[in-house]
Amino acid sequence: MEQAFADTDAFNQQLMRDGHWVFGGGLQPAGDAKVVDGQATDTVVTDGPYLESKELIGGFWVIEAPDLDTALRLAAAGSKACRGKVEVRAFEGTD
């Protein structure tokens, strides 16, 4: 795991050097999560992740890429660095 952290840090540095970095970060374990539901009159706060899943989000990147091919190439490099799957999505309203 220590090597994955080092490789991810190196990947982050490369994103910054190449001008793709916008924001990113690792997340605390899902067991430390709080779920907030403010839809009703009283806000309800519960412990734990909202979703039951074998795969949990350990972190994320927000990058800037000129096209989908570049984003996919960067995602593949990020996946290799962090030793996990990377999901690619554009922000709503972007091409």
Residue ranges and their predicted role:
Residues 1-95:
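Conserved, structured core segments of small domains
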